[in-house]
Amino acid sequence: YLNDIVNAKIKCSYCLTEPSAGSDANSGKSKAIFSEDKKHFILNGQKMWITNSGFADVFFVFCKIENDENLSCLIVHKEWGVKLGAEENKLGIHGSSTRQVFFENVKVPVENLLGERNKGFKIAMNALNAGRIKIGVANTAIGKRAFKLGVNYANEREQFGEKIANFGAIQEKIAQMATQ
């Protein structure tokens, strides 16, 4: 899978959040049980707020296997019966698709267990931590750009014959932007 992902031959989606679990990912209800021949998992569950789900070919699904206490991760192909909810109407990040994802008796080969059984939570957290760093960097850049635009605007806009950058209220707002 890695070669196809890196070379953009397949698109992926990361399925962790569930309606009843929220931030406590390990309390999710999605579950996989072994098929009678033990060659497949039968996956059932629901995920929500799943980024890229509308155009993903493959889903990394965090679920419990049988009666395990901890999550595992299964690699699930869309064509195996994954169903998608309606597109979420988001305030921002319009370049990605965000939907609910449903698994109803989806048959997944046992070879598609990513890593070790019961070790999915560590996989999930490692992926989230990398994303958190990127989001922090992006938000810092957005803040710097907003500050620069605000200062430029305050130095260009005039009211009552004076640049608004000279008004105390505007200076206070700019100072707050610079320090926060």
Show the residue positions of the predicted features:
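Active-site-adjacent elements of ketosynthase-type condensing enzymes
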Residues: 19-29
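Glycine-rich phosphate/pyrophosphate-binding beta-alpha loops
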Residues: 21, 48-54, 93, 130
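A short, Trp-centered hydrophobic/proline-enriched beta-strand micro-motif
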Residues: 8-16
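Glycine-rich beta->alpha junctions and the first turn(s) of the following alpha-helix
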Residues: 82-180
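A structural signal for short hydrophobic beta-strand segments in well-ordered beta-sheet cores
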Residues: 30-34
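A short core secondary-structure module
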Residues: 40-84
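Soluble sensory domains of the PAS superfamily and closely related sensory modules
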Residues: 4-9, 77
